[in-house]
Amino acid sequence: MFALGIYLWETIVFFSLAASQQAAARKAASPMPPSEFLDKLMGKVSGYDARIRPNFKGPPVNVTCNIFINSFGSIAETTMDYRVNIFLRQQWNDPRLAYSEYPDDSLDLDPSMLDSIWKPDLFFANEKGANFHEVTTDNKLLRISKNGNVLYSIRITLVLACPMDLKNFPMDVQTCIMQLESFGYTMNDLIFEWDEKGAVQVADGLTLPQFILKEEKDLRYCTKHYNTGKFTCIEARFHLERQMGYYLIQMYIPSLLIVILSWVSFWINMDAAPARVGLGITTVLTMTTQSSGSRASLPKVSYVKAIDIWMAVCLLFVFSALLEYAAVNFIARQHKELLRFQRRRRHLKEDEAGDGRFSFAAYGMGPACLQAKDGMAIKGNNNNAPTSTNPPEKTVEEMRKLFISRAKRIDTVSRVAFPLVFLIFNIFYWITYKIIRSEDIHKQ
């Protein structure tokens, strides 16, 4: 009886142990609930403190950065800035977030968990304005890997300062930078690095209205030294080549046509003063308006731009065409002035000859006659006085033709000289700005 009781007891204990082992095996096979796992990983019971950086009092945290450009545009010359929409991705290792209790290799967490972990204090050094995106939810991504690697991605729109050199405008190439810098951590605590696999990526089909974004990536390091210490800084440079299509249609071609229109006056008769003066004044005023319009969308800089030189030379040619007619008209009328001068000289000589005769006005007798004793009237006559004779009509006509011929010769020379000089200016202008200066910019 006693042996039977012992046998039953051993049987019960055996089955109890087997059941407990099976329960333990089932418990080990089923993963920990996510909420419990997260509380254990970064909750209050975990001892994780988001205020303390990884490797505290140890080596600096290396943060690898890369950006994906969604859109690039709104490049403003007046304010010298540009607008860009990007995905900013930062990746670093936090040993405190390494785990082995959960089977997944990585965890994609809700953006609200970002407040529970440590993050780099990255900011954009040349930022003038920025905003996050919250439609339809916060555009943020947080991913934690088993080895403690943290990926933090965020979508932001930035307005960044871009100092521009407009000397070659509108044939310029601008370099706009994006600087990523640590605000509070010195290089003893935090270091930014560009991702070697793809630091800067651009969306397919990205186009700009006035610029071409060069494909080559210019990535640099720009460590900053302040009174508070040495801070890590990385920068990306975007090389933007301006497209001339808009400016050719809106500025260069209209001003070129205005200059050519001013040359029409060289083929108009010099006697048609209203037509030539009206054409000259109209082209000058139009060119002035065109020149003012070219500067309306540009900042007030102290140096001369390429478009300023073009507009100034075009205005000079148009104004010179107006002055050319003034010179032609002046020379054509010189024969009348010369005849008027000769007429005044003859009158002056006649007056001088009259002053040499005797004047009997004091005796009550006229200067023309003298009463003799015998009653005969003696007419005053001075045989030595020069007699005035008008120049022959042929001489006047020849003089008129001479001056008109000179005036016409100026018009004839202007018909060739103005286009030729303007052509030479164009050759030098386009060679200088499209070839020579363009090569200098690419070398830099």
Swiss-Prot record:
Keywords: Cell membrane, Cell projection, Chloride, Chloride channel, Disulfide bond, Glycoprotein, Ion channel, Ion transport, Ligand-gated ion channel, Membrane, Metal-binding, Postsynaptic cell membrane, Receptor, Signal, Synapse, Transmembrane, Transmembrane helix, Transport, Zinc. The record marks L285 as: Important for obstruction of the ion pore in the closed conformation. Residues 269-273, 327-412 are cytoplasmic. The chain crosses the membrane at residues 247-268, 274-294, 306-326, 413-433. Pfam families: Neur_chan_LBD (PF02931), Neur_chan_memb (PF02932). InterPro entries: GABAA/Glycine_rcpt, Glycine_rcpt_A, Glycine_rcpt_A1, Neur_chan_lig-bd, Neur_chan_lig-bd_sf, Neur_channel, Neuro-gated_channel_TM_sf, Neuro_actylchol_rec. Its main location: membrane. The keyword Lyase does not apply. The keyword DNA-binding does not apply. Strychnine binds at Y226, N227, T228, G229, K230, F231. Highly sensitive to activation by taurine despite the presence of Val in position 135. In mammals, Val-135 causes a drastic loss of taurine efficacy. The alpha subunit binds strychnine. Subunit of heteromeric glycine-gated chloride channels. Plays an important role in the down-regulation of neuronal excitability. Contributes to the generation of inhibitory postsynaptic currents. Channel activity is potentiated by ethanol. This is Glycine receptor subunit alphaZ1. The gene is glra1.
